[in-house]
A protein has these predicted regions:
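Catalytic cores of the polymerase beta-like nucleotidyltransferase superfamily
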Residues: 1-435
Length: 435
């Protein structure tokens, strides 16, 4: 194990501990660590703090008693939190010796030091207690095999697997053994995701091992549910486009389905016009599925794919609607000249479908579809009448379907700028409508 960092990284864990003092849960962790000699900050948290980045959550290891440690930490956080703040939630997974503390301001994951073995490729690991070294060597990549002990006697030192600190300084992703991707093929998705997030590249041997694992159809040895969990993490990245593009470049998408593809430029165009109340993750997912729309039984193909990945029914159906209608919506938007025509083309569509159709139209001269999609997303979809069906009933219009048709005609005229402002003009337009 290495105890000091190479050039470009802190020589010891001093800066890590200083930064930890300022993070949610950090002071409480340091307080608990004073009472025992086995607590260390590890994994992504240690990696990010050494790089000078703020970690998404804090990862901690102890020799034993992860559940008890989590409960003690939860109590300490609750005691120092402002009044009326919700108490942290503690989740325990006894099989793996892990626990987590979640609260509004942060999250701490606690694990017992362990070694892992795999009965078969892709199987969940068999876990037993392990040493500091074994716990580091079980991890996915060397840059995540770094620990900063919090116990007073070791505080300020670093513990790292071979090559870990050098790889971190050089921006390299390296697996810790040759069977890593076969043991746990989700590491293929993590290789792309970490590379995209951190701007790191795969070390030469690791890149070859990844290619070999994909060629051996390693992803077929794990459940689609596990793939789906990793894909959702990629979709949640700050730069999800880069993460998905990396998955495509690595060959993961093609290994999952031959029709699955990702066009980063198209995706970025769609995100550029998607409003804040849209779902970027669903837009990106729909863009990935466009290749299935031309396939025989394309809707069923997409349904089975997303269902296998265990997306929620609501998200699954919204993505399928978006992917299926975006190409035809492009045709409708090309022909839409009046605001009312744009509105009618898009009114029943998802926001993601409008943005994706607009992105598809960006390659055309003058970009009429893109302009129409952007105009609807920004302004037209928010246009409302001041009147409603009760106003028409009060004016003597009989109840029935014509109420809706008259309101629609009035809305169209308002969208097209044919009405003066005010309820009276809208009511007059509705009453004059030819229905």
């Amino acid at each position: 194990m290495s105890a000091a960092g190479p050039a470009g990284l802190p020589a010891d864990a001093g800066p890590v501990l200083e930064a930890l003092e300022e993070l949610p849960g950090g002071p409480e962790l340091l307080e608990l660590a004073r009472l025992r000699d086995d607590v260390a900050l590890v994994g992504g948290a240690a990696r990010d703090l050494l790089l000078g980045h703020g970690p998404r959550e804090l990862d901690v290891v102890v020799d034993s008693g992860a559940a008890d440690f989590a409960r003690e930490l939860s109590s300490l956080i609750a005691a120092t939190a402002p009044r009326r703040t919700a108490r942290p939630t503690v989740t325990v997974h006894d099989r793996f010796g892990t626990a987590a503390v979640d609260w509004k301001a942060g999250r701490v994951d606690i694990a017992e030091r362990r070694s892992e073995s795999y009965r078969a490729p892709g199987a969940l690991p068999d876990v037993r207690g392990g040493t500091v070294e074994e716990d580091l060597l079980r991890r996915d990549f060397t840059v995540n095999a770094i620990a900063a002990p919090l116990a007073p006697a070791l505080r300020g030192t670093l513990q790292a697997a071979p090559h870990a600190l050098e790889d971190l300084a050089a921006g390299r992703l390296r697996v810790l053994h040759d069977h890593s991707f076969l043991d746990d093929p989700t590491r293929l998705l993590r290789l792309a995701r970490y590379g995209a997030r951190l701007g790191f590249h795969a070390e030469e041997r690791t890149a070859q091992l990844a290619a070999d694992a994909l060629a051996a159809d390693a992803l077929a040895s794990i459940s689609r549910a596990r793939v789906g969990a990793e894909l959702r993490l990629a979709l949640a990245e700050a730069d999800a486009v880069r993460a998905l593009d990396a998955l495509g470049a690595l060959g993961v998408l093609a290994a999952l389905e031959p029709w699955l593809r990702f066009d980063a430029e198209l995706a970025r165009r769609g995100l550029a016009i998607l409003p804040p109340d849209g779902r970027p993750d669903l837009l990106l997912l729909a863009e990935m599925l466009l290749g299935a729309t031309a396939a025989e039984h394309g809707e069923r193909v997409m349904f089975d794919f997303l269902d296998g990945l265990e997306f929620t029914a609501a998200d699954r159906d919204r993505v399928i609607r978006t992917a299926l209608c975006a190409p035809s919506l492009l045709t409708d938007l090309r022909a839409a000249e009046l605001p009312s025509q744009m509105y009618e083309a898009l009114a029943s569509r998802t926001l993601e479908a409008a943005a994706l159709a607009g992105a598809l139209g960006a390659e055309e001269p003058h970009q009429p579809a893109t302009d129409a999609a952007r105009r609807w997303l920004q302004t037209l979809r928010h246009v409302r009448l001041s009147i409603n069906g009760d106003d028409l009933l009060a004016a003597g219009v009989p109840a029935g379907p014509q109420i809706g048709r008259r309101l629609t005609e009035a809305l169209h005229r308002k969208l097209d700028g044919d009405l003066s402002n005010g309820r009276d003009a809208e009511l007059r337009a509705a009453l004059e409508a030819r229905v």
